Amino acid sequence: MNKMLHNLTLHTLGACALMIAAGSASAAEKMTLGVSIPTATHSFTAGIVWWANKAKEDLEKAHPDLKVIVKTAANAPEQANQLQDLLTVNKMDTLVIFPFESASLTKPVAQVKQKGVYVTVVDRGLTDTSAQDAYVAGDNTAFGKLPAEFIAKTLNGKGDIVALRGIPTTLDNERFEAFTGVMKQHGGIKILDAKYGNWNRDDAFKVMQDFLTRFKHIDAVWAADDDMAVGVLKAIDQAKRSDIKLVFGGAGAKGAIKTLMDGSDPRIQANVSYSPKFMYDAIMLTAEARLKGERLPANTIIPSVLITPQTAKEFYFPDSPF
């Protein structure tokens, strides 16, 4: 597999989308593009669904011979079944998939690829990369590294912290490994525990309740997701704990960015970008390449950056579901 990372700025991605909208490529024959994504169970996946349907709208308007079918799944088995429907019923020749889970979707995606379908995997990578043609994602290493650096600096290299993880996926592993890699450089910081919160505010609330019961002093929390940060803050407030000075979420949800902008919660001091718009970008880039009879680079990584109160306005999109 080509290991070279093809870094694209959002500006470049936007330009690609405009080229599609302008009808820069024409299909020689009818093409069916299947899009498989999780259901909107929280604000980030709501953004994924919204951007996927936006891509469908833009592409079908620009290309009458292109059919885009968007399917959402509530769990991994349902998503695997939908892949078979897209293949046998809808006769797709191209697939863009945001896997519900990495391990359980790898074999179903591989089976689709073996039937000659071009496969672009988005965000949650598969455990076997030979099951895909292309991979488009945010910078998961930076997503873990930047918060770790910020927390370490804020704590002056000393303190007790807890961490939340998402769902067992390759991207969660990348984020956590990057986070702990930075923390290993700061011997004065102790990670008391890390547990999965499933990128869900209710699950994160329960995880944080457990942390608060077991640990009588916590300096900071890496919530690793803005939805999970909501659950974390709720648990802290209910427990009336004043020792926790910093809660770092992630992905740039509009509620979190608004809080960062207006300074209404001193525990929210920074964020890290990871917009669900990359779903739109992945679909548009894949369609553009396939309409031209071309392939995407093996890896397209969209940069993540630290969001501060000074830069928050650039990342605030009030009309977005995320």
Indicate residue ranges for each PLM-predicted region:
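A residue-level marker of the well-folded mature domains of exported/periplasmic proteins
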Residues: 3-6, 27-322
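N-terminal signal peptide c-region/cleavage motif recognized by signal peptidases
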Residues: 21-24
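Bacterial N-terminal signal peptides that target proteins for export
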Residues: 1-13
